[in-house]
Amino acid sequence: MDDNKSKALQAALSQIEKQFGKNTVMRLGDNTVQAVEAVSTGSLTLDIALGIGGLPKGRIVEIYGPESSGKTTMTLQAIAQCQKAGGTCAFIDAEHALDPQYARKLGVDIDNLLVSQPDHGEQALEIADMLVRSGAIDLIVVDSVAALTPKAEIEGEMGDSHMGLQARLMSQALRKITGNAKRSNCMVIFINQIRMKIGVMFGSPETTTGGNALKFYASVRLDIRRIGQVKEGDEIIGSETKVKVVKNKMAPPFREAIFQILYGKGVNQLGELVDLAVQQNIVQKAGAWYSYQGNKIGQGKNNVIRYLEENPQISTEIEAVIREQLLTKASDQTAAHDETEEEPDLLES
């Protein structure tokens, strides 16, 4: 760049900085650009599939799937992990279905969890935006998009048509929340439900509620499905769950994670820790015996899990080694491009 252009650029940057504040415009290679912080999902397998060790702070995340697939469980686990790291969390319960006792069992500090049960969609999204702008919240969960009923629909008659009202509401809210979330480094997780498109002959007939806006604004989209049952004898004690990373602006997408969700306990964290440790040869398996650093730690997987429960420092040590090995591999791959996406059709519902 010649001197005149360089001086003109410097003058423009100084003016922008004076008017809008420091770091409004930065060079992409500047050291001031920080790596994205991540909040663990509570599942080590899913953290690795996401490529950055969890869900990204300061971004919009969508978790969707069929009923009883583990969507709320996943978000409550993320809240528990965020609170353990010293974060403050909020839960906007538009479905009016949050169970405090279940949340406590999953490790959520319910005494310090902010909860709102809004009357209508506008109120829910306004509360979310105000909490984001406060700069004091690290993680907000909105459960769910389908329950964000516009005020006009609540106040209207039962048979009234309100075409595209919820889609327009979501698009307007996300335009505000996305930028505010980035500035305050607050993650906003939207739980969403699945609907069927009528008359689809080819491709998947499934779609999510609330229009297209959330698909565009979300940095991470997770599709969660129950694929089997976990049994102890004849008793069903949990479900086998598969999560597909459908969209990821932070790392390569389309990875999958399979793990168990145990009823009343949440993700079987120690079970997947043992499996990954054996897979990475951190824990050696010979027949039914498992050994770590030359010492036998149990015969059979259940005994190893019991040993790790009694020795949490060893499970923490093993987890740190797994994260170091697998997340380094993930970060070496080319990240997905964070393309500029066009504004979605507001009226599509």
Swiss-Prot record:
Residues 339-349 have a biased composition (Acidic residues). Belongs to the RecA family. This is Protein RecA. Residues 329-349 are annotated as: Disordered. One of its GO terms (biological process) is DNA recombination. GO terms for molecular function: ATP binding; ATP hydrolysis activity; ATP-dependent DNA damage sensor activity; damaged DNA binding; single-stranded DNA binding. It comes from Acinetobacter baylyi (strain ATCC 33305 / BD413 / ADP1). Signal peptide: none annotated. It is found in: Cytoplasm. GO terms for cellular component: cytosol. SMART domains: AAA. CDD domains: RecA (cd00983). It comes from the Bacteria. Can catalyze the hydrolysis of ATP in the presence of single-stranded DNA, the ATP-dependent uptake of single-stranded DNA by duplex DNA, and the ATP-dependent hybridization of homologous single-stranded DNAs. It interacts with LexA causing its activation and leading to its autocatalytic cleavage. ATP binds at G65, P66, E67, S68, S69, G70, K71, T72. Keywords: ATP-binding, Cytoplasm, DNA damage, DNA recombination, DNA repair, DNA-binding, Nucleotide-binding, SOS response. Its main location: cytoplasm.
